[in-house]
Amino acid sequence: KKLNPYDYVIDGFHKANDTPWKDYKFTEKELVWLSEIARKNTLILDVFARPYALLDLKTTTNFDGVIMSYQNSKVSQELSAQLIFGARSAKGKLPVSLGSRFPIHTQIKTQALGRLTYGTPESVGLSTVKLKKIDSIVTTGLH
């Protein structure tokens, strides 16, 4: 009921990745929740675990998107958020076969919408050195 007022729901499936032997499966409760959310809302599922977790999904019929982010790390989460909101393009391919719904090399390519991304100043034509000088001047002015 709490999600009813929302048009879009982004569900991040996070599992610890400190060891490759850690359990990566969805619980039965999580599968029921996903099914119910997808039935009533626009759902994007972002999996921060091994791709084999997708084998637990009985259906993705009502899912509007599935993103395979692989690692549960700060960098993966930041890049994934940029992808979802259009700052980065999607171009990866699923490296393993996960049955008929997700055969090997499954992919959906998207184009970046030209929004601001996380990155270095040089990636958008700016200079780190000059920005540090500006930062120093502003800091001095504030004190």
How would you describe each model-predicted region?
Residues 1-125, 129:
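C-terminal non-catalytic regions of proteins with extracellular/luminal or membrane-system context
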Residues 122-143:
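Beta-lactamase-like hydrolase cores
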